[in-house]
Amino acid sequence: MKRSVNAWAVGADYGFEETFAKVKAAGFEAIELNLDADGAHALTMETTAADLQKIVEISKKFELPVSGISTSIGGNIGSADEAERQAAVDVVKKQLFLAKHLGASAILAVPGAGNTPWGEAHEICIEAYRSLTPVIEDTGILVGMEHVWNGFFLSPRDLAYTVDEIGSDFVGVYFDIANCADRSKSEDWITFLGERIKRVHIKNFNRKSVFEFAFPLLFEEGTIDWVPVMAALRKIGYEGPLTAEFGAPEGDPSENLIKSADAIRRIQCL
């Protein structure tokens, strides 16, 4: 399991070269980039193959491969609104394009419903991804669906059902260790989802009470029990990257990056 980190941890004041340099110096072995709105190291819907070639050269320079392509836009692929749904499909296609050119093996997808009722939205999402399956399989890029707090995937059973109904070996789960830790055990989700898990976000969580919680940095105090989490990942045979995801601080992000990479090293040994 390689140590990876999402570029959001560096901050928008730094360009691609500085971002790769800081991530490499901190001790990470890979980096996850993002399809976003405009930003210093953001990929956008307008990013071209020529733009990506420059990033490939930076990646080679620092010997830091791109582990995946995440995104903060275009999640409503389960919407009954055709325009919303098509915009989400276009985002997935763009992520696949970016991943292919950057040598990344996976993208992160966040399905959503818009204003569509939950059950209907899931069936629309499944049909949308079935229609995308030939494109996905042609690229050979893995698509991992992430459970976020948007009310779409409420349990590991919802995730498993959606993935299984789509029915492609290239569509699975991008599991975020902390996103389910508010009311359940992360290791239980890992065990239930099993080999559907294609990629992992390693993130901390601190549940102080039913109504009070936080997402501390990996090297800070949290309530996730990393021993059973790592045991569950090993049991399902997961060997992909552990990608840290956290926001950038004000000022230089180097200290947070170094401490986070060290925290992953320690967690890997559990």
Where do the PLM segments sit?
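Glycine/Thr-rich phosphate-binding loops of Rossmann-like dinucleotide-binding domains
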Residues: 41, 117, 210, 252
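Hydrophobic faces of well-ordered beta-strands that scaffold small-molecule active sites
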Residues: 3-7, 31-33, 66-71, 107-109, ...
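Acidic/histidine-rich catalytic cores of soluble enzymes
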Residues: 30-34, 130-223
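N-terminal pre-domain/capping segments
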Residues: 1-101, 130, 168, 195, ...
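Active-site beta-loop-alpha junctions enriched in small/polar residues
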Residues: 6-10, 34-38, 71-74, 112, ...
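Long hydrophobic alpha-helical segments typical of transmembrane helices together
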Residues: 229, 238-253, 257
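Active-site acidic/histidine proton-transfer and metal-coordination neighborhood
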Residues: 17-18, 53, 57-65, 75-172, ...
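A short, acidic, amphipathic alpha-helical segment used as a generic capping/interface helix at domain edges
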Residues: 223-235
